[in-house]
Design a protein with these regions (language model features):
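Membrane-interfacial helix-loop-helix junctions in multi-pass membrane proteins
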Residues: 53-61, 77-87, 165, 188, ...
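Alpha-helical transmembrane segments of integral membrane proteins
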Residues: 2-3, 89-128, 167-308
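An internal, D/E-rich "acidic patch" concept
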Residues: 58-114
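Membrane-water interface segments at transmembrane-helix boundaries in multipass membrane proteins
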Residues: 84, 133-194
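N-terminal signal-anchor/signal peptide hydrophobic helix marking the start
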Residues: 6-16
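Transmembrane helix irregularities
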Residues: 30, 139-142, 243
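Hydrophobic alpha-helical transmembrane segments of membrane transport/permease proteins
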Residues: 15-66, 156-175
Length: 308
């Protein structure tokens, strides 16, 4: 088990190098001068050039990237061009808000997706099955930003029940959490149905039914337990994705999370903040995936033998 964890952690190194190189190249090629943005449009050219030299922006691409990697290894990701604060201080201040959205989104997706998926599987080809699959297809296909705008229009503009954005107590969490949860619930529903259908066709399920075991026991104890592995995979990936990719939702609702911080940094060509955000979110996503893989061993002990 420990060797497996060590291997996964070592594999993170080339992944992080590739991710940071790609993002660094994109920011390098993006039009705009960070020094000019910091000093303002009216700043003298001499002052801008002096700041560029001080920031090392006149160096070649690879020199700048290697300097970033060296500093990152030492734990120094620099300071934000716009606020002057250490970038990880900015990220840690906003990350709890992103976690709140991700956790609520996953709770909504599990609360809706697993029960609906089980019902669809046990009533295959019924009206309920067809209706739930149509809704799941709509949920998967629906753009996040469109759903977010429709919820704002309905509950904030028309009904006035919920705030349209920002962070102002529990009521402000509900719309973005629903926006995230709907898409994830659709994916969890489809995976639960598919996994349950595969399991309930197995011989041991037929045997349990032939012995007169109650249908609820067959479904909830025997079938669902063995169908959990792919469901856990999807839920884990959804949680990691919500932690690292709730950018659109946070932007639509002006939610003060890491995703919105990264969008603001991209607009302002705040390279240190963008790079630190990408590194942080990539690490979070990778760690969540590792934890999901390790969770398999507790659901199915047979998998423990593979973690060597």
């Amino acid at each position: 088990m420990y060797k497996y964890i060590l291997k996964r952690l070592i594999l993170l190194i080339p992944v992080m190098l590739g991710v940071t190189l790609l993002v660094f190249a994109i920011m390098y090629l993006t039009p705009g001068d960070p020094a000019q943005l910091i000093l303002g449009e009216s700043a003298p050219k001499a002052a801008v050039e002096a700041l560029r030299e001080k920031m090392g922006l006149n160096d070649s691409f690879f020199i700048q990237y290697l300097r970033f990697v060296k500093n990152a290894i030492m734990g120094d990701f620099g300071r934000s061009y716009t606020t002057g604060r250490e970038v990880f201080a900015e990220i840690f201040a906003r990350f709890p808000n992103t976690v709140v959205l991700a956790v609520l989104g996953v709770i909504i997706s599990i609360a809706i997706g697993i029960p609906v998926g089980i019902i669809s599987a046990t009533r295959q080809y019924s009206l309920m099955d067809s209706f739930s699959m149509v809704l799941a297809l709509l949920g998967v296909s629906m753009p996040v930003f469109w759903l977010g705008l429709m919820l704002i229009l309905a509950f904030s503009v028309k009904l006035g029940l919920l705030p349209s954005g920002g962070f102002d107590g529990l009521s402000s969490v509900i719309p973005p959490a629903i926006t995230l949860g709907v898409g994830s619930a659709a994916i969890v529903t489809r995976m639960t149905r598919s996994s349950m259908l595969e399991v309930i066709r197995q011989d041991y399920i037929r045997t349990a039914r032939a012995k007169g075991v109650a249908e609820k026991v067959v479904i909830n104890k025997h079938a669902l337990k063995n169908a959990l592995i792919p469901i856990i995979t999807v839920v884990g990936l959804q949680f990691g994705g919500l932690l690292g990719g709730a950018v659109l939702t946070e932007s639509v609702y002006s939610w003060p999370g890491v995703g919105r911080l990264m969008v603001e940094a991209i607009r302002q060509k705040d390279t240190p903040t963008v790079l630190a955000s990408v590194v942080f979110l990539a690490l979070v996503y990778s760690v969540v995936n590792l934890l999901v893989d390790l969770l398999y061993a507790f659901v199915d002990p047979r998998i423990k033998s593979q973690y060597k």
